[in-house]
Amino acid sequence: MSKVAAVLKVMPDSPDIDLDGLEADLSESLPDGAEINGTDTEEVAFGLTALLTTVIVPDDSGGTEAVEDAFGAVDDVESVSVEEVGRL
């Protein structure tokens, strides 16, 4: 089965959030078959920094939805959006 790489933009709910801790929480929340391939940051506004997390998932029905739901359920996450998707 082929795999898909997706860049997910994770917005914390406060500029005071520890991004390293948030990244660890996101990693722990991943569903089976998904893995984080890298994380970058993006300054948004007013001191708020988003995490740009590259996730590798199987190319099956549902795509990144399980990862989006898992990330959205993590404490201190305001929103999750898909920025890019591509086949590997």
UniProtKB/Swiss-Prot annotation:
* Alphabetical list of InterPro entries matching this protein: eEF-1beta-like_sf (IPR036219), EF1B_bsu/dsu_GNE (IPR014038), Transl_elong_EF1B/ribsomal_bS6 (IPR014717), Transl_elong_EF1B_B_arc (IPR004542)
Looking up Pfam families in the UniProt record yields: EF1_GNE
Q: Which UniProt keywords apply?
A: Elongation factor, Protein biosynthesis
Residues in a coiled coil are none
Q: Does the keyword Chaperone apply?
A: no
Q: Could you give a GO molecular-function term held by this entry?
A: translation elongation factor activity
Q: State the function annotated in the UniProt record.
A: Promotes the exchange of GDP for GTP in EF-1-alpha/GDP, thus allowing the regeneration of EF-1-alpha/GTP that could then be used to form the ternary complex EF-1-alpha/GTP/AAtRNA.
Q: What protein family is recorded?
A: Belongs to the EF-1-beta/EF-1-delta family.
In Swiss-Prot or TrEMBL terms, this protein is called Elongation factor 1-beta
Q: Which organism encodes this protein?
A: Halobacterium salinarum (strain ATCC 700922 / JCM 11081 / NRC-1)
